[in-house]
């Protein structure tokens, strides 16, 4: 991979939206080819408004209340809102969906390590599996001395050193919803995310996590596979 221009990437404003939906059983009927064509065309057209569809993810069964998740990102949050609204209003798939959860984050430079760039922004290919969750730090976290927070974050990073195949996308979400951060882990295999998450529990920074649910996890799937799998 070419050397990254960290200054340019950290100067980039990029909003991310993770939107989770459920579908009522039978709402899509049995004949789904037209639904697939409609949804495929819609997602491809989003590039014209500057929206990148990073992936569609099957979260069915990993949660009882949701069937799939869509990850989009763009320079302007209004573009993401338009994609979200148009999907629900203009596509057969979207009209059959009920929103379960949606969260927005914005890339900003990491506080202590400016080379910590989200995988999607660094130009990395999407992972085969994803785990997305929001989190909120303790009230004390932001009042701690910089060196103490730096130490804990460095320890947190060291705990992940054996999982270089698990790529992190950590973005602030202050004022964009009910959370302070949104994190999306991407990996070639799901067990790698599971093992990493367990490792990260044994770090001091864990003491300063006040909330970190809900979790949305599953494989990245093409539109055709997703639509055929829906109830």
UniProtKB/Swiss-Prot annotation:
Metal-binding listed as a keyword: yes
Protein name per its UniProtKB record: Coproheme decarboxylase
Membrane spanning residue stretches: none
Oxidoreductase listed as a keyword: yes
Ligand binding (Fe-coproporphyrin III): 156
Entry superkingdom: Bacteria
Reactions that this protein is recorded to catalyse: Fe-coproporphyrin III + 2 H2O2 + 2 H(+) = heme b + 2 CO2 + 4 H2O; Fe-coproporphyrin III + H2O2 + H(+) = harderoheme III + CO2 + 2 H2O; harderoheme III + H2O2 + H(+) = heme b + CO2 + 2 H2O
Covalent link (Isoglutamyl lysine isopeptide (Lys-Gln) (interchain with Q-Cter in protein Pup)) residue numbers: 44
Active-site annotation: 133
NCBIfam families in the record: HemQ_actino
Gene: chdC
